[in-house]
Curated annotation (Swiss-Prot):
MF annotations from Gene Ontology: enzyme regulator activity
Residues covalently joined to lipid (N-palmitoyl cysteine): 27
Protein species of origin: Pectobacterium parmentieri (strain WPP163)
Name recorded for this polypeptide: Penicillin-binding protein activator LpoA
Gene: lpoA
Segments for region (Disordered): 298-336
């Protein structure tokens, strides 16, 4: 028999083990449940996590996890998967779940580029009932539906979102509010209907007025802003000014002692270099400031230009077109004439011209530095501009062309006058008009390839969607098609813009040196085309537009746009009537910004508009040289130029906003 104390000891050990086993047996066998989801809060986890929780959860929480999964899928850029989950949401939802469903509907529509549906979904929400997280998403979706178009609704969304943000996001909100304001014309900002209780919005508009009235003088601007802060001490921008405004106030202009002008003075491009140089000299000497009140001058008898043949826009030699007797449309764009001359460089500044066709670029840059130049304008040809990266120079450089891949250099800006540049501006303009599916109708060949790629890239950046392309042959093919009565069916193919691009050719004033990029295309698309951007000569356009009209009814007809390639001197009244409704872009100088100067320069170049455009480029080269520091240092800085409204991108690539005109009843009218 075991001793009593041993039995008691063993029993004392066994009983707790049995009790623990009984306790564990009563516990559930699966892992502990995750905390209940909060659909009104943040969605920080991955969509995979939320989808897994949805599969494992009970019916009570299943819809919450699914709503979070949809939001996470949208954050990850997976709109198709988000749409699939959205369509399987249960019909019976709580009030909070229905509210989140409605907000997700707006976000999903915006992600699918259906801005009308997104706006409709937002309008059904009670903003006051939303959580702070939901309010932030509500305003972000409102901002997205504006698609970059400045409006009072966009400003109100930024203002409402501002108290919800902190740190870098708060500063970014102030910067974007200011950007939207500065993108408005004075007429647009002056016409804003501000309610009596919108003190913050009124403060923003007053700050804009102070900036516009004093931006030529940093000292005056600083004083005006200080007065503004006194009047609006609690305004969010009174504590932290927008970054761009701070840069303007703190801007320190750099001095320019001498300019080196790099141009090809021999070879095919000589005629273009001559036009640029003449425009540059005219702007430097202040001649364009007096052109508006002086009589047109006779064409010069320069033997270097006499008897030359102008390359046409397709790269072949052609005679200059006949004179165009009709007056240019009166544009709303202000004349750019004296602005840079009065506020910029002195007309007595030394300028030395270097011939890039006679020696290597590296030698010229070294020589220019030794000659005391502090600013280089040029080179002009794209292959020479590409060499700048491998030939670094301490000099500030305003290149007159743009490489395919721009690398940010602290001392280089790029100013190009090319059909690709014009196509990028057209994509922005067409997108701003609310079009959803544009088609680029371009000629077969290298020029068409490059324009299609440039337009498609810009369109994708604006909308996140693909543009369509369609090609046509020469005038003989077009005539054969129109004689057959077949018309032109718009059947585009989506352009898949290649990220790896070969070096493109150079087009200067119509001279093309090809090195093409072949855009890739997928299956044909014919429906929902609401805009057609046509790259054609006047003769080609006179055939293409009637063929489009022949195949489409007036109700289903897409809006038609064209490039400056279609506009030249000598277009008669029959052509203008045939082009009814078509919109096209061109430089302000040819759109009537300065009619007297246009008449003078057109006469000087025998109505060859390609050379007039290069003359305007020379004018703007002087303007940009006068404001090189602002363009290089102040993001978004704008200058009214002869080739467009000039502004600098992040890499100091000069963007040109062109003037758009439209044919109406045989007349040219500005597109406002």
């Amino acid at each position: 028999m075991l001793p009593f104390h041993l039995v008691r000891t063993q029993a004392g050990r066994v009983i707790p083990v049995l009790l623990a086993a009984l306790f564990l047996a009563g516990c559930p066998s699966h892992a502990p449940q995750s905390p209940p989801p909060e659909v009104q809060g943040k969605a920080d986890a991955s969509s995979d996590y939320y989808l897994q929780q949805m599969q494992q959860s009970s019916d009570n929480n299943k819809a919450d996890w699914q709503l979070l999964a949809i939001r996470s899928l949208l954050q990850e850029g997976k709109a198709p998967q988000a749409s699939q989950q959205f369509n399987t949401l249960p019909e019976k939802l709580s009030a909070a779940q229905k509210q989140e469903q409605q907000l997700l509907s707006a976000e999903l529509s915006a992600a699918q580029n259906n801005m009308d549906a997104a706006k409709a979904a937002l309008s059904q929400l009670d903003v006051g009932a939303l959580s702070e997280q939901q309010k932030s998403r509500y305003y972000q979706t409102q901002i997205k539906t504006a698609q970059g178009r400045p409006s009072i609704e966009l400003l109100r969304a930024y203002i409402a979102q501002e108290p919800l943000l902190k740190g870098d996001e708060h500063q970014m909100n102030l910067d974007q509010t200011w950007l939207a304001l500065t993108q408005m014309s004075p007429q647009e900002s002056g016409a804003l209907l501000i309610n009596a209780d919108e003190n913050v919005l009124q403060g923003w508009v007053d700050l804009l007025n102070n900036y516009q009235n004093n931006r030529e003088s940093p000292d005056q601007l600083q004083s005006a802003i200080q007065d503004w802060k006194t009047r609006y001490p609690h305004h969010p921008a009174a504590k932290n000014l927008p970054m761009q405004l701070n840069q303007v106030i703190n801007y320190q202009p750099s001095s320019v002692s001498s300019i080196a002008l790099l141009l090809p003075l021999n070879g095919q491009a000589q005629v273009f270099a001559n036009a640029i140089q003449q425009g540059f000299n005219a702007a430097k000497n202040g001649q364009i400031a007096t052109a508006a009140v002086s009589a047109p001058v006779a064409p010069p008898t320069d033997t270097a230009q006499a008897g030359q043949v102008t390359p046409s826009s397709d790269g072949q030699n052609a005679q200059s077109p006949a004179p165009y007797s009709d007056q240019a449309v009166a544009s709303t764009t202000p004349a750019p004439a004296a602005q840079a001359t009065s506020a910029g460089l002195s007309s007595s500044l030394p300028v030395k011209v270097y011939d890039t066709s006679s020696q290597p670029l590296a030698n010229i840059l070294t020589q220019a530095q030794q000659d005391g130049a502090s600013l280089v304008i040029g080179p002009l040809l794209k292959n020479e501009v590409d060499q700048l990266a491998s030939n670094p120079s301490p000099l500030n450089i305003l290149a007159l062309n743009q490489p395919e891949r721009v690398e940010n250099s602290p001392n280089i800006c790029y100013f190009a006058l090319s059909p690709e540049d014009e196509a990028r501006d057209a994509a922005k303009f067409i997108h701003q008009q609310g079009k959803q599916q544009p088609l680029v109708l371009a000629p077969r060949g290298a020029l068409g390839d490059r324009i299609v790629n440039a337009f498609a890239q810009a369109w994708n950046q604006q909308s996140g969607t693909s543009a369509l392309q369609q090609r046509f042959g020469n005038s003989a093919e077009l005539k054969q098609a129109i004689n057959s009565g077949a018309g032109l069916s718009l059947n585009g193919q989506p352009v898949n813009v290649s990220q790896q691009q070969a070096q493109a050719g150079t087009t200067i004033g119509g001279l093309t040196i090809p090195s093409q990029v072949q855009p890739t295309a997928s299956s044909s698309v014919s429906g929902n085309i609401d805009a057609v951007y046509i790259i054609a000569t006047p003769d080609e356009l006179a055939l293409i537009k009637p063929m489009i009209d022949m195949r489409t009814s007036s109700r289903a007809r897409p809006a038609l746009y064209a490039s400056s390639r279609s506009f030249q001197a000598g277009l008669g009244p029959d052509f203008r009537l045939e082009m009814e409704g078509l919109q096209f872009s061109d430089i302000p100088l040819l759109a009537g910004a300065n009619p007297a100067l246009m008449q003078q320069v057109s006469s000087q170049f025998k109505n060859d508009y390609s050379l007039v455009r290069l003359y305007a480029m020379g004018m703007d080269a002087w303007t940009l040289a006068s404001h090189f520091g602002e363009m290089r240092q102040i993001p978004g800085h704008q200058i009214s130029g002869a080739t467009g409204m000039l502004s600098a991108g992040p890499d100091c690539t000069i963007n040109r906003q062109l003037t758009w005109q439209q044919y109406r009843q045989g007349q040219l009218v500005p597109v406002l």
